[in-house]
Amino acid sequence: MPLDGVKNIVLVLSGKGGVGKSSVTLQLALALTLQGKSVGILDIDLTGPSIPRLVGLEDAKITQAPGGWVPVTVHPASTNDGAQRGSLRCMSLGFLLRDRGDAVIWRGPKKTAMIRQFLSDVYWGETDYLLVDTPPGTSDEHIALAEQLLRPATTNPAAGSSTMPRLAGAVLVTTPQAVATSDVRKEVNFCVKTQIPMLGVIENMSGYTCPCCGEVTNLFSSGGGQVMAQETGVKFLGAVPVDIQFGELVEGKVVDESDDESEDGAQPEQKREQKQDEVVDERPLVERYKDCWSYSRFEGFADTLLSEIEGGVAY
């Protein structure tokens, strides 16, 4: 089966949209690869896939192999200066769309069938961690995912081993404000009812750090995620302020050609010349990510998750 080589599956959940699940998924994946782990990202947000854009591979296409669909490689495994870096690959419906602007207008049964196909027809090979980026709420995608991953593991008589990977648990993502935490509480309830272990809560967008003076401004208040975690008995992994550098990294500083003139009166030709003069950083995404200050936060999250998962601790 395509999931045979996957050792652990981690779900990234939130009851609220727009809290940054996809960016958290990507940063956790990058941090884990820098720990030497081979990582895959499965994007099951079928109507709004974000992973292809975040990894800068919107034009990549899925190839078919005898073992199933082959995920898109973000970067291969390598060893630099004695440090082992694991591989990162991803799979998303965004890679299968004929045009990236096409809307996905599917009813529940078709979504369920697509989730099942992702879990049965994608060949991941040897993968330490498969992170699943989910849509907000507790809808068809979540139910289909839980049904597939929570089935009793079957045993292959020839190999004498389980053919299903371990569902290590879920990471819950929220922003500090009450309108977000109230919906994430419902996600906690979903995990309890489906018996999905909860690895912890990450409070995303917890303030904004000025790049000039370092002053932190609480744009969306602060501490709401920690309070929710304490009240629901789930481990609080930590808070992450807004990181402008990471935003620029995944956006690629795209020039908006629709702007005829900038505020200072520069013409489009001048802006294109300025763009051509910029030095293009050809390093892989994972190496450029190490320059973002949020990397240290997610490195800590990755350490905590590795100790919980490989040490057998979950809530």
Curated annotation (Swiss-Prot):
[4Fe-4S] cluster binds at C210, C213. Pfam families: ParA (PF10609). Its cofactor is [4Fe-4S] cluster. Its main location: cytoplasm. It is found in: Cytoplasm. Keywords: 4Fe-4S, ATP-binding, Cytoplasm, Iron, Iron-sulfur, Metal-binding, Nucleotide-binding. Coiled coil: none annotated. One of its GO terms (cellular component) is cytosolic [4Fe-4S] assembly scaffold complex. ATP binds at G15, K16, G17, G18, V19, G20, K21, S22. Residues 253-282 are annotated as: Disordered. Binds 4 [4Fe-4S] clusters per heterotetramer. Contains two stable clusters in the N-termini of nbp35 and two labile, bridging clusters between subunits of the nbp35-cfd1 heterotetramer. Residues 257-266 have a biased composition (Acidic residues). The keyword Cytoplasm applies. Residues 269-282 have a biased composition (Basic and acidic residues). GO terms for molecular function: 4 iron, 4 sulfur cluster binding; ATP binding; ATP hydrolysis activity; ATP-dependent FeS chaperone activity; metal ion binding. GO terms for biological process: iron-sulfur cluster assembly; tRNA wobble uridine modification. Gene3D superfamilies: P-loop containing nucleotide triphosphate hydrolases. CDD domains: Mrp_NBP35 (cd02037). SUPFAM superfamilies: P-loop containing nucleoside triphosphate hydrolases. It comes from the Eukaryota. The keyword Nucleotide-binding applies. Heterotetramer of 2 nbp35 and 2 cfd1 chains. HAMAP family: Mrp_NBP35, NUBP2. Belongs to the Mrp/NBP35 ATP-binding proteins family. NUBP2/CFD1 subfamily. This is Cytosolic Fe-S cluster assembly factor cfd1.
